[in-house]
């Protein structure tokens, strides 16, 4: 496995003092105590790099960022692609990309701009209405825009790092700490969660990049509000990422390389060491709660006045 790693991500992958100057960071100040992630060694990316015996070159993660957007701080922007390189312009041996949950939560770059998202590119904010608008459904064609942006992001990285091993990690559902049942909203704005992961896989396969299909593990990770991992959730993510990177071929053999929707591997394929991060792995298997309507229309939405919160209050 690679010696030097760079990370491209959103808030889940930030940590105070470890991201480029001026980048928004989630894991800082009082949030460190709230999540229990008080030391950088507890982050998923530090744990993953340690697992492979590597070192961090650059953590190019910006809190709140989407893939789509075309301008900084979107993942699909020249500035983010430039930030993946070392201070001397050197390319890493491997890039691990874990980004896209904000695209799912907002329903796209335009909705992020209209909702006055904190990480919206200035070029898009300038076109947004003065008053905040929180639309319930993603605009038609959202998954195609996401896949196009994801492929463009990959092309920007490849142009700067032609010899680098690039890993695309699929999105993983979270669960609030202490909750005994699945809570994740699998159809938040009318575009199913599975379609985002299928788009990630397709874009990666078409570009010849690796896919770490962490979703295929079939597990929820622990988070303070369902999105941002606790210290335990960080260990769970790191374990799922490492296992899916090491077993890419076996996952493809079990599930195929086409659209997987919500397919996961049998829990018997997962090693005991990985499952030990859940006190009862059977209870932490992820599953959709219902298929009645998009979650943003539902009376059980946990934060209807929030821009987004991907949890169901009826679970």
Feature map (PLM): residue ranges:
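Conserved SGNH/GDSL esterase-like catalytic core that processes O-acyl groups on lipids
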Residues: 4, 15-129, 135, 140-144, ...
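Viral virion structural and adsorption modules
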Residues: 3, 84-86, 198, 206, ...
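A short helix->loop->beta-strand "cap" motif at the edges of active sites that frequently abuts
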Residues: 161-165
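Histidine-centered active-site loop/cap adjacent to the catalytic His
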Residues: 192-193, 224-274
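Generic structural signal for well-ordered alpha-helices
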Residues: 81, 150-154, 197
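Substrate-gating cap/lid alpha-helix
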Residues: 156, 173-214, 240
């Amino acid at each position: 496995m690679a010696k030097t790693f760079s990370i491209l991500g959103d808030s889940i992958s930030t940590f105070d003092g470890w991201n480029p100057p001026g980048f928004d960071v989630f894991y800082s100040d009082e949030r460190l105590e709230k999540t229990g992630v008080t030391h950088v060694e507890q982050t998923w990316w530090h744990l993953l790099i340690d697992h492979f015996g590597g070192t961090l070159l650059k953590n190019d993660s910006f809190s709140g960022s989407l893939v789509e957007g075309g301008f900084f701080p979107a993942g699909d922007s020249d500035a983010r692609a430039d930030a993946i390189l070392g201070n001397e312009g050197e390319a890493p041996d491997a890039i691990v990309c874990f980004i896209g949950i904000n695209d799912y939560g907002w329903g796209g770059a335009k909705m992020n701009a209209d909702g006055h998202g904190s990480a919206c590119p200035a070029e898009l904010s300038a076109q947004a209405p003065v008053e905040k608008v929180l639309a319930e459904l993603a605009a038609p064609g959202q998954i195609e825009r996401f896949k196009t942006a994801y492929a463009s992001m990959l092309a920007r990285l490849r142009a700067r790092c032609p010899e680098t091993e690039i890993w695309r990690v699929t999105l993983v559902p979270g669960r609030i700490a202490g909750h005994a049942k699945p809570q994740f909203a699998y159809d938040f704005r009318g575009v199913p969660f599975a379609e985002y992961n299928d788009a990630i896989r397709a874009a990666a396969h078409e570009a010849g990049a690796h896919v770490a299909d962490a979703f295929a593990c079939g597990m929820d990770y622990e988070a303070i509000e369902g999105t941002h991992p606790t210290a335990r959730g960080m260990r769970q993510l790191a374990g799922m990422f490492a296992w899916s990177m090491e077993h890419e071929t076996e996952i493809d053999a079990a599930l195929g390389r086409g659209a997987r929707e919500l397919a996961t591997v049998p829990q018997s394929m997962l090693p005991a060491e990985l499952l030990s991060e859940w006190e009862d792995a059977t209870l932490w298997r992820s599953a959709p709660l219902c298929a009645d309507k998009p979650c943003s229309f539902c009376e059980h939405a946990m934060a209807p006045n929030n821009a987004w919160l991907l949890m169901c209050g009826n679970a």
